[in-house]
Curated annotation (Swiss-Prot):
Record field: catalytic activity: benzyl alcohol + benzoyl-CoA = benzyl benzoate + CoA
Protein name: Benzyl alcohol O-benzoyltransferase
Species this protein is from: Clarkia breweri (Fairy fans)
Function summary: Probably involved in the formation of benzylbenzoate, a minor constituent of the floral aroma.
One Pfam family of this chain: Transferase
Top enzyme category: transferase
Record-stated family: Belongs to the plant acyltransferase family.
Entry's pH dependence statement: Optimum pH is 7.7.
Keyword Lipid biosynthesis recorded: no
SUBUNIT field: Monomer.
């Protein structure tokens, strides 16, 4: 069965509740790191997990009750998630560990897992019903830091959906919490990986010493694409055939040293740039999220669940990007990623404090986050691993439409690959799909028609 975006169903929700830690936890104030309270992380990010009811030992268990108890027990260890965010002098964010709890919704849907189709991928039908935006709950300050909805399906399967205040954790961090919930739900006494706060590691130096030219945070005048009310959401699957087609267009000296993600990113950057039709003389940016945990000496602790990534930017003009071979974009991306070191992370923290915690550049910017190894699909609440686990949609963020994710997926033929949800204005989406199709089929792209002739 194919992915059915036209699927419609009813969801019956119970009244939202707050789940508090199962035991009393300390009331204290914990500062976020100076990397975390930047403007570009002050938004809510949605995650969704689909679970098949095929475990006979769990036949009589209610996933809502099992997960509710798992959350309460996990919050004893991850108690800052049960608190509320406050802002103090200098726009500094601090968690007040109040123990108020995370928001939880119990729900039932009159649909089966099979009706979603064999290829579960964003955008998901009726998503706003599977992760309900409780009025008044979505603020960055003074609001629940997590909202979780568990929806039973009429076939016995269920959906776990979560909304995270991104200032609190990155993909690796929220997966640690979700795995802890799963372990506690399955009866563990403690999480296998104990959480570590240690946000001071990523604090600014005194005085701040910005040692890199952080082009990802440059102030650029201009506008990003509009209108926001005409954004289209689509997903594209990349298996071995598609990746091989891209690699054939790369110079031999880059084929062996470039990762699949880097090759894919170079291709998508060009296609998306053609789609948004900037002036060829305008700068365009490709921001790649780089997990910096291993860049430190010693590496950050395994249980560190805060944001620990950099967003280096590859920068060139639209004309150069689209008129040069794919290897040109690839080398820019690889060079930007190589910049990320421990010193680079300290420099980012220093920049945040010195310049008022700015948003990253969004004009003519595309940002991709690779969650293929984050472990969303491995989260097990007792019913086995998720049949889909990961970000719920592309285009999330303070500025809609800038961000995409690389998500692991097995397609209808059973082939493992990567799915990319992307968000663009409807007209731009058609151009993107055409450019991508031409690239994968080795067809020449008519660059000139995507730019104004007078500017070429």
């Amino acid at each position: 069965m194919a992915h059915d975006q036209s699927l419609s169903f009813e969801v019956c929700r119970r009244k939202p509740e707050l789940i508090r830690p199962a035991k009393q936890t300390p009331h204290e104030f914990k500062k976020l790191s100076d990397v975390e309270d930047q403007e570009g992380l002050r938004f809510q990010i949605p995650v969704i997990q689909f679970y098949k009811h095929n475990n006979e030992s769990m036949q009589e268990r209610d996933p809502v009750q099992v997960i509710r108890e798992g959350i309460a027990r996990a919050l004893v260890y991850y108690y800052p998630f049960a608190g509320r965010l406050r802002e103090v002098d200098g726009r500094k964010l601090v968690v007040e560990c109040t123990g108020e709890g995370v928001m939880f919704i119990e729900a039932d849907a009159d649909v089966t897992l099979e009706q979603f189709g064999d290829a579960l991928q964003p955008p998901f039908p009726c998503f706003d019903q599977l992760l309900f935006d409780v009025p008044g709950s979505g603020g960055i300050l003074d609001s629940p830091l997590l909202l979780i909805q568990v929806t039973r399906l009429k076939c016995g399967s269920f959906i776990f959906a979560l909304r995270l205040n991104h200032t609190m954790a990155d993909a690796a961090g929220i997966v640690l919490f979700m795995k802890a919930v799963g372990e506690m739900a399955r009866g563990a006494a403690t999480p296998s990986t104990l959480p570590v706060w240690d946000r001071h590691i990523l604090n600014a130096r005194v005085p701040p010493q910005v040692t890199f030219n952080h082009r990802e945070y440059e102030e650029v005048k201009g506008t990003i694409f509009t209108p926001f009310d005409d954004l289209a959401h689509r997903s594209f699957f990349f298996g071995s055939t598609e990746i091989s087609a891209m690699r054939k267009q790369i110079p031999p000296h880059l084929r062996s040293c470039s990762t699949t993600i880097e090759v894919l990113t170079a291709c998508l950057w060009r296609c998306r740039t053609l789609a948004i039709k900037p002036n060829p003389d305008e700068e365009v940016r490709m921001i790649c999220i780089v997990n910096a945990r291993s860049k430190f000496n010693p590496p950050l602790p395994d249980g560190y669940y805060g944001n620990a990534f950099a967003i280096p930017a590859a920068v060139t003009t639209a004309g150069k990007l689209c008129n040069n071979p794919l290897g040109f974009a690839l080398e820019l991306i690889r060079k930007a990623k190589r910049e990320v070191t421990e010193e680079y992370m300290h420099s980012v923290a220093d920049l945040m404090v010195a310049t008022g915690r700015p948003h990253f550049t969004v004009v003519n910017t595309y940002l991709v986050s690779d969650v293929t190894r984050a472990g969303f699909g491995e989260v097990d609440f007792g019913w086995g691993e998720a049949v889909y686990g990961g970000p719920a949609k592309g285009g999330v963020g303070v500025i809609p439409g800038v961000t995409s994710f690389y998500i692991p997926l097995r397609n209808r033929q059973g082939e493992k690959g990567i799915v990319l949800p992307i968000c663009l204005p409807s007209a731009a989406m058609e151009i993107f799909a055409e450019a991508l199709n031409n690239t994968l089929n080795g067809k020449e792209i008519e660059i000139a028609k995507h730019f104004t002739q007078s500017s070429l």
